[in-house]
Regions:
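Structural microenvironment flanking redox-active thiols in thiol-disulfide oxidoreductases
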Residues: 55-91, 100-107
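Hydrophobic beta-strand anchors of alpha/beta hydrolase catalytic cores
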Residues: 43-44, 71, 117
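A generic structural signal for alpha->beta connector loops
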Residues: 18, 68, 94-95
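Thiol/disulfide oxidoreductase modules built on the thioredoxin-like
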Residues: 88-93, 100-150
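N-terminal targeting signals for export/organelle localization
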Residues: 1-22, 150
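C-type cytochrome heme c attachment motif
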Residues: 49-56, 116
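Short pre-active-site segment immediately N-terminal to redox-active cysteine/selenocysteine motifs
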Residues: 39-42, 47-50, 113
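A short beta-strand-turn-helix
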Residues: 19-43
């Protein structure tokens, strides 16, 4: 589908909604809204182990993380065992991963599906929404937007 067909989040230019998510996997911290206003811009990636396009974007997330971009993950309607298998197989670019087990945070963010990625400013303001999987050609644009937000 054309990206213009997707519904954009109403939160662009707004602070991230208040939330606190438990860890999605053992050994990795969960995620709270306060973690997204820590003075550094970062990407927030909604994903699911069951999501085929999430697997396809894994190399691009790895490339962004290797370039120094902090990426936090939100595992959507998933269980810890499947999230762990996904990370073991496709890589783990995430600094933290929160478990959105019932999809409530996805609704609060205005996300229309997975994968979906947001650029969050150092003060916790949502700057950009990338709908769908990040493709190789999207990496330079996201990297530039992240650097501009610093």
């Amino acid at each position: 589908r054309d990206r213009d067909d997707f519904v954009r989040s109403r939160l662009i230019g707004q602070p991230v909604p208040e939330f606190s998510l438990p860890p999605a996997v053992e050994g990795k911290p969960g995620l709270a809204s306060t973690d997204l206003s820590d003075g550094k811009p970062q990407l927030v990636n909604f994903f699911g182990s069951w999501c085929i396009p999430c697997r396809a974007e894994a190399p691009q997330l790895a490339a962004l993380a290797a370039a120094g971009v902090p990426i936090t993950g939100i595992a959507l309607r998933d269980d810890p065992e499947n999230v762990r298998k996904f990370l073991d197989q496709y890589g783990d670019p995430f600094t933290r991963i929160g478990a959105d087990r019932d999809g409530r945070l996805q609704v609060l963010f205005g996300a229309s599906g997975v994968p979906e990625t947001y650029l969050v400013a150092p003060d916790g303001t949502i700057l950009l929404q990338h709908i769908g999987d990040i493709r190789a050609e999207d990496v330079p644009e996201l990297l530039r937007a992240w650097k501009d937000a610093a």
